[in-house]
């Protein structure tokens, strides 16, 4: 039986360099820090009666391990894989082990308006939704979508 937001947190995963939000390329990513993003996610989940498990790593294998953990203990995944979006078959394969678990991919910038190599995302092949170009508010949209999907009891409602 799918886990609901009422009994399992949303896993929110952040990939490489997102620990530098607010410092790195603010003209692209804005001035909000990762702590600001976490606070937004906590508030958004709480509005739906839920909680979040918010993490960041610069290491692909650690993100894969956390995805494996999420498939057992969480009601959904919001993931900003950052640069791994364009390169990581390992993250795609890990997400593909999460049968029935809703996944939303988030990008702060609009990856389709950037360099051509950023236009393709492996993660999008598994994601139930993709949010790009909405700034850090995209994370709120991701949390809200997971809340809707987890509340409905179906990853692909």
UniProtKB/Swiss-Prot annotation:
Catalytic reaction list = 3-dehydroquinate = 3-dehydroshikimate + H2O
Q: In which pathway does it act?
A: Metabolic intermediate biosynthesis; chorismate biosynthesis; chorismate from D-erythrose 4-phosphate and phosphoenolpyruvate: step 3/7
EC number in record: 4.2.1.10
The annotated active site, in chain numbering, is 29, 107
Give residues annotated as binding substrate.
Answer: 80, 86, 93, 108-109, 118
- Keywords of this protein's UniProt record, alphabetized? Amino-acid biosynthesis, Aromatic amino acid biosynthesis, Lyase
* Coiled-coil regions, chain positions: none
**Tell me, what is one Gene Ontology molecular-function annotation carried by this entry?**
3-dehydroquinate dehydratase activity
Q: Site (Transition state stabilizer): which residue positions? A: 24
Keyword Lyase listed? The answer is yes
The record's listing under InterPro entries reads: DHquinase_II, DHquinase_II_CS, DHquinase_II_sf
Question: Assembly and partners?
Answer: Homododecamer.
UniProt cross-references to PANTHER family, sorted A to Z = CATABOLIC 3-DEHYDROQUINASE (PTHR21272:SF3)
HAMAP family in the cross-refs:
AroQ
Function as written in the Swiss-Prot or TrEMBL entry = Catalyzes a trans-dehydration via an enolate intermediate.
What is this protein's record name? Answer: 3-dehydroquinate dehydratase
* Source species: Streptomyces coelicolor (strain ATCC BAA-471 / A3(2) / M145)
- Tell me the classification of the organism that encodes this protein: Bacteria, Bacillati, Actinomycetota, Actinomycetes, Kitasatosporales
């Amino acid at each position: 039986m799918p886990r609901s937001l009422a009994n399992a947190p949303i896993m929110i995963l952040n990939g490489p360099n997102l620990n530098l939000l607010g410092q790195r390329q603010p003209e692209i990513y804005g001035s909000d820090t990762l702590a600001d993003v976490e606070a937004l996610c906590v508030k958004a989940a709480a509005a739906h009666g839920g909680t979040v498990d918010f993490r960041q790593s610069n290491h692909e294998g650690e993100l894969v391990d956390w995805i494996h953990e999420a498939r057992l203990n969480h009601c959904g995944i919001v993931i900003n894989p950052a640069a791994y979006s364009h390169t990581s078959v390992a993250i795609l394969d890990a997400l593909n082990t999460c049968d029935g678990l809703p996944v939303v991919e988030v990008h702060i910038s609009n990856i389709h308006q950037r360099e051509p190599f950023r236009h393709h995302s492996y993660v999008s092949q598994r994601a139930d939704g993709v949010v790009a170009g909405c700034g850090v508010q995209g994370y709120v949209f991701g949390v809200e979508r997971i809340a809707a999907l987890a509340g409905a009891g179906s990853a692909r409602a």
